[in-house]
Every structure is written in C-alpha cells, then in structure tokens.
Amino acid sequence: MATPTELGFSSPGGGGDDSDDNPPQKRTSKRTASETATEEETKKKKKKKTKHNTKMASPPSNRIWNEEDELSILKGLVDFRAKTGLESKIDWDAFYCYVKGSIHVKVSKCQLMSKTRKLKKKFLDQMEKIDQGNDPHFTRSSETEAFGYSMMIWRKIDAEYTNGVMDKAHQSESGEEVFEEDEEVALIDKGAAKSGKSPHEAVVVVDKITTKKNGTAGKESDDDDDDVLCAVRDAFETTMMSQGLSDYQKKLQLEKLMNLGTGKRRELSNEWKALCVEELKLNINKLRFSAKLAEAANDGK
C-alpha cells in the first residue's frame, strides 16, 4: 500500500503541473515563427523600396536623338535634295534651318552634321553585310523606313565603301565640315553671308560659284552649262544604256546630244531633273507603304 508521501508525489496535481509547462513552449515557438515571417516581409519591402529609389535617383540618359529624330533627318535630307535639286551637294546651313523644326530637341548644326555622318556609316555597314550574304533583319517598321531613306541618299557610294574607299570627312577653311565624293557640302561663302542673305536665300550650287582666295563669291561661269551637260549625260546613261545599243551607237548618240543647241540641252536637262524629283517622291510613297505593310505583318492584324 502506498504511503501518503508516494500518493502526494504522484497526485493529479503534479501531473497537472507537467501538463501546464508544455503549452507555453508551443505558443512561444509559434510567436517566434510569425515574428520571423513578418520581419522577412518587412526586409523584402525595404529592399524593393530601396531598388525603386535607386532607379528613380539614377541620372538621366545622355541620349539626344530618338528614332523619330533619325527618320526626320533622313526624310528631310531626301525632301531637301528633291526641292533644291542638289543631288550630291548639300548646303548645311540651309538644311539645318529646314529640318531643325522636326527634331524634338534643340541641336546645333554641328550635332546635326555629326548625326548624319553616323547614320551614313550605319547604312554603309549594313550594305557591307548584305554584300557578304547577310540579309538584314529589321524588327521595327522604323528600321525598315530608315534603311529605305538611306538607300535613296547614299546608295551611289555603297560600292566605293565596300571596296574600302569610303570617303572621309575633312574641314574646309571656313570651318564647315565637308564630305568628299557624292556627299560634298555646298558651303555658303563668307562673302555671300556678309551680304545679308538668309540661309534659305543663299542655297547655291557649288558648281555655279567661283570662290576667290579672299572668300568672296565670283560670278557664274560656264559651269552652269557643264551642269546642263551632266544632266543630259546622266539622262542618256540612265535611260538609253539598257536599250541593247552597241558601244559605237551609244557613243554616236551621246555625241549628238552633247552637240545640241544650248536651249535644247537646257530643256532636256530641266525635264530630266523634274522626272528625278517625281521619282524621289514615288520612292518615298513606296517606302512609307512598305513600312506600313511590315508593321501590319508584325502586328498580325
């Protein structure tokens, strides 16, 4: 028979004390897990906020030009050449005044010339890859449109570039940037600028000006007639060279054209230039349609 002491030791009260010790430990464990989860969520929120603030505090991009600006420059160059009749010579003062309104930020003439040069190099690099058998892959309609405009402007010098004879830029005495070969710059002479003419009034063809050493513009010479002869020759080579004529027949017909009277030659020259302008406009419309077509194909609508 158990003694009172033994009964008291094993009494329900003692068992109750043991049962009362366990629940607080479990509750403490649950609180710790909950608090840990809350702290982790708080840390994650702080990290996200820190990253967001870092992005907001990052310095703005130094990029000046966007894709719309590049298209404005290229389209402006095509339109400007069509209106002025300057195929290979550009008056950058007049072109700057012509195109600056379509650019979303204010840029200088030097920045415009530099950007144009970069666009030219980009196009020539693309053509070099195409000649190597690598077709371009345009993912945006703006890229297709830019390439088409570049073709209108610089396709004549593509062969020279791919043969390693890319024309180089140099500085003229008046500080204007000049491009050799097909992108010569028709600079406004200092003397003409002093006469008070605006850039739009001072658009001149370099072939028509004899520039003196002191910087004043000379009188128009026989270069005007040379320009007419060049236009007639270009018209003949473009339209008649593919007619299946022999070399002798071509030479004979060209000599006859060169010996025409001044009035008749000028008439043919003016008509050919007008046709070239119309062809440029047609190419622009085709290019815009191609861009819309490519965009519709990409969207699938």
UniProtKB/Swiss-Prot annotation:
Tissues/organs with expression: Expressed in the apical meristem and young leaf primordia. Detected in the vascular tissues of cotyledons and leaves, in hydathodes and in the septun of siliques, but not in roots.
Record gene name: GPL2
Similarity comment: family membership: Belongs to the GeBP family.
Residue ranges of the region described as Non-canonical leucine-zipper: 268-289
Subunit description: Homo- and heterodimers. Interacts with GEBP, GPL1 and GPL3.
Protein's name in the database: GLABROUS1 enhancer-binding protein-like 2
Domain of life, source organism: Eukaryota
Region (Disordered): 1-62
Keywords for this protein: Nucleus, Transcription, Transcription regulation
Organism: Arabidopsis thaliana (Mouse-ear cress)
